[in-house]
Each structure stands twice: as C-alpha cells, then as structure tokens.
C-alpha cells in the first residue's frame, strides 16, 4: 500500500507551505547551526537553491538579557527570505519573551529547538533535553505560539534514546499545540551524530492520517540525489540539510560545479563576511567553512598549505592561497 502512496506522492506532489509561505515542490532547507549559518553562508545557500534558510540558533536567555553577540545573530538580509530564526531554552516565560524579541526583526518563521544534543544545551534541559520532559516542552510550545503572530515551527529528534522513541505521539501533540511545521532528525539524543539516521519513523509520522502539517526530514542527506530518494521513499514535504553543507553551499545546486568555481564561491563568502562585519570576524566566520570544505579533502601534500590557510589573518593571504591551490590542483 505504501508503495502505491509513494508513487502517488511522487506524481502529484504539491507545493509545501508554512503558514502563507510557499516553499515550492520538494524544497530543500538549510538547517540552523551555531557558528555555521552566518549571513554570508545563508546568502550563498539561498543562491544555489535552498528554498529556506535559518540563522544560527540563539539562546532565549541571552536574547532576554540583550547579549550583543546574540542580538547580532538576528540580522536578516532581504535577499535571503524566506528565513527562519531558531531559539532554544528550557523556561516557557523566557522563550515567549525571546520569541517576541525575535519577531521584532520580522523573520518568516520562528523555530523552536527541541533537538540539539550537545551537552551545553541538552545537559541543561534545553534542546533535546526537553525530550525527557514532554509536559515542559509542550508548555514552551504553547507559550511561544501565544506570544507571537509569526508561524512557529519545531525541530526535534526521534526521542531521548532507543527505549523512548516518542516522535509519533509527540508530533500529534505539537500539532495540537498549533505549530505550522515539524522537522524531524532521524536520530535519538543518545546517538548524538553517530550511526546513521533512521528515516523509518519520519515516514511513519508523515503517513499518520492525523498529521496535516508539513513534515520535514533531516539526517545524513549529502546531495540533491539523496534528497530526491528521501522524498520518493518517505513522502516527506521537505528535506533539511545540515552538516553536509559545511563549506559546501553548492550542495543545494541542481548542476555540478567545477572545483575552480567552488573556490570562487568560498572567496565570495569570505568577502561577504568581511564586508558585513570586519576582517577579523569575517575571516573567523569563514575559517570554519574552509576547514570543512570537501574541495580541500584528499589533495596531495596539502597539509602545510591547509594550516597556513586556516591561520591566515588577512584576506589577501587567504585569496593568495586560493590562487596557489588553483594552479597546483585544479
């Protein structure tokens, strides 16, 4: 029966909407990631085909306390819309207040982080830590939805561990709270990022006849081809790409790019980040992407040059290294 459903969904796919935001048919979304999804990177991901992008996730407590570095993460460019801002925290009142602050910069979506597994977040009862306290998680969701008029969405995981796979019931509960879409990462908190993402439960949530909100799948998607297989096999409304985008904004592109072109894209990302901040912060933001970019993987005798590239403190020095890489390898 599900095979027939998959064929039907593949042939008669309709545009995905979050509230009134039309993301088109089978959209790819950029996941919110701390120290990764800065504005320069988001702009490039958008250019290469991301239907929607998200800022770095931000702490509700830091927003309420007006911490300047956190407030800077709320900057949105008109050309990157639709864009979402994701917040995390464990207190309903502060999350609602943070959502009101976020709404003042007019994002298209406010997303609630109930999935981050790292110790500094989940260990304090926020992010995926809330999967151990569903009543509080739902209280936060209702409080935020009641505080803002912007569509509210949620990103979460399958459950805390394999003995507590709660996503099927949780999806219904979150929908009943009034969320506009749900993103599910196909791992538990205990798995962190180990093993492989299990899309089986994501597909079950999507097939649940009670569920009518968009379901976005996330986990181990590294290309458009893999995203297509996820759409075909599990029937999800959208696919979110996270770690595979590090240093690789072209992962959203429909056409294959050459390495020289990819290097030019990284150079543009560097320039955008420097222009929007300053040389020090622009290089710092870009350095993380250079360290992760697949175009530098496996280059022979590149170790010394790589260290120089990641230690460079001047834009011209990094661009000079790019030129050297072009001549030696591409």
Predicted regions and their residues:
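Glycine-rich, positively charged N-terminal anion/phosphate-binding segment
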Residues: 15-19, 24, 33-108
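Active-site beta-loop-alpha junctions enriched in small/polar residues
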Residues: 33-35, 58-60, 88-90, 115-117, ...
């Amino acid at each position: 029966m599900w095979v027939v459903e998959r064929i039907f969904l593949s042939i008669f796919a309709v545009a995905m909407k979050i509230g009134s935001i039309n993301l088109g048919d089978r959209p790819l979304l950029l996941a919110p990631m701390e120290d990764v999804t800065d504005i320069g990177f988001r702009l490039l991901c958008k250019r290469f085909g991301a239907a929607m992008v998200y800022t770095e996730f931000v702490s509700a407590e830091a927003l309420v306390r007006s911490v300047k570095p956190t407030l800077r993460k709320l900057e949105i460019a008109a050309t990157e819309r639709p864009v979402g801002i994701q917040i995390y925290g464990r207190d309903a009142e502060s999350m609602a207040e943070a959502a009101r602050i976020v709404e003042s910069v007019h994002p298209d979506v406010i997303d609630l982080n109930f999935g981050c597994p790292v110790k500094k977040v989940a260990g304090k009862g926020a992010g995926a830590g809330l999967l151990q306290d569903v009543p509080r998680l739902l209280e936060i969701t209702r409080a935020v939805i009641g505080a803002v008029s912007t569509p509210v969405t949620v990103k979460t995981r399958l459950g805390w561990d394999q003995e507590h796979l709660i996503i099927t019931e949780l999806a219904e509960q979150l929908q009943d709270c009034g969320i506009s879409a749900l993103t599910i990462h196909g791992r538990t908190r205990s798995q962190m990022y180990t093993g492989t993402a299990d899309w089986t439960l994501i597909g079950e949530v999507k097939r649940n006849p009670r569920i009518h909100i968009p379901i976005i799948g996330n986990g181990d998607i590294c290309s458009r081809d893999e995203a297509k297989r996820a759409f075909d096999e599990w029937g999800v409304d959208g696919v979110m790409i996270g770690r595979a985008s590090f240093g690789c904004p072209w992962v959203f592109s429909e056409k294959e790019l050459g390495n020289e072109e990819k290097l030019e894209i990284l150079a543009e990302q560097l320039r955008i980040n420097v222009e929007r901040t300053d040389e020090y912060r622009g290089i710092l933001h870009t350095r993380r992407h250079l360290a992760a970019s697949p175009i530098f993987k496996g280059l022979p005798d590149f170790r010394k040059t790589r260290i120089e590239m990641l230690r460079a403190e001047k834009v011209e020095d990094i661009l000079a290294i790019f030129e050297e890489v072009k001549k030696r390898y591409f």
